[in-house]
């Protein structure tokens, strides 16, 4: 963040729990973090939580002092600019339509703005990653759009929020609604998780907002409608295993094409 001149604040993070089952998950999560070299992780009680951030919900928590917050919008732009400075090129409004394997093992990628010759293809197309895989001759990927809604709280609420507060992870290692202060002084509360109607389903619903208020109140004690200034929705891809129906967030693998 410093190198890219992106606002960053070292806040730490609380991953909170309410039940014995949550405590067991946090213990497992903490062991995994320590195995991965994360320093300073602690399981703390409510008294210690109040010292760190009395606005946080939960009966106990895993404290992660190395965590922080930054501006995700400026960070994304900075990464794009840095890539250009290092030789990357962007071809906008350029849809990938197919691929032809060359005799030397390289690939000719066909797009709506001409062909591109390459040795490697990195599929990071998100919601359209299954379409890209299909064009490359790799079937079997099914992507379902999952919608998540957020509330943006006024900076009057931000004065109470010192630290990002997340719930104990679910058994599949996903997280539900959390409360995160921003570098600008607001608070983001969300997301929820809904199966979207399609890849463009950005509509906010009253039922979802009511549910978000309830779940957000468990994370942030100052969740009050008087602080609400904006709500929005985003779509994230979930890969569905056709054989088992299992949901996967990320798939990292290397495949031969053709």
For every predicted segment, state its role.
Residues 63-120:
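Helical element adjacent to the flavin cofactor pocket in flavoenzyme catalytic cores
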Residues 16, 98-99, 179-180, 252:
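A structural signal for short hydrophobic beta-strand segments in well-ordered beta-sheet cores
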Residues 1-52, 58, 174-177:
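Dinucleotide-binding Rossmann-like beta1-alpha1 core, especially the glycine-rich loop
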Residues 149, 155-185, 206, 218-219:
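Mid-domain catalytic core of redox enzymes
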Residues 72, 78, 174, 183-184, ...:
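C-terminal catalytic lobe of FAD-dependent flavoproteins
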Residues 41-44, 89-91, 229:
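General small-molecule cofactor/ligand-binding pocket signal
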Residues 115-161, 205-206, 223:
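Central helical "cap/lid" subdomain
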Residues 21-25, 52-59, 100-107, 241-246:
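A short, glycine/Asx- and small/polar-enriched loop/turn
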């Amino acid at each position: 963040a410093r190198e890219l001149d992106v606002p960053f604040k070292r806040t730490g993070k609380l991953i909170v729990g309410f039940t014995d089952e949550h405590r067991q998950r946090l213990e497992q999560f903490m062991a995994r973090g320590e195995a991965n070299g994360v320093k300073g992780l602690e399981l703390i009680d409510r008294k210690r939580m109040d010292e760190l951030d009395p606005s946080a919900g939960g009966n106990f928590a895993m404290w992660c002092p190395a965590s922080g917050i930054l501006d995700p919008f400026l960070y994304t732009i900075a990464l794009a600019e840095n890539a250009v400075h290092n030789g990357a090129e962007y071809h906008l409004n350029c849809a990938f339509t197919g691929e032809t394997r060359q005799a030397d093992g390289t690939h000719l990628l066909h797009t709506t703005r001409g062909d591109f010759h390459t040795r490697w293809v990195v599929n990071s197309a998100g919601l359209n990653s299954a379409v890209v895989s299909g064009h490359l001759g790799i079937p079997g990927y099914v992507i379902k759009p999952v919608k998540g809604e957020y509330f943006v709280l006024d900076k009057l609420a931000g004065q109470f929020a010192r630290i990002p507060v997340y719930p104990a992870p679910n058994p599949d290692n996903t997280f539900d609604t959390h409360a995160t202060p921003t570098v600008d002084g607001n608070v983001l509360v969300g997301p929820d998780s809904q199966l979207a109607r399609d890849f463009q389903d950005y509509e906010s619903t009253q039922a979802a907002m009511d549910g978000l208020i309830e779940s957000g109140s468990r994370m942030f004690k100052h969740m009050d409608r008087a602080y609400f200034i904006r709500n929005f929705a985003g779509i994230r891809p979930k890969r569905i295993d056709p054989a088992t129906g299992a949901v996967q967030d990320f798939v990292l693998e290397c495949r031969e094409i053709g």
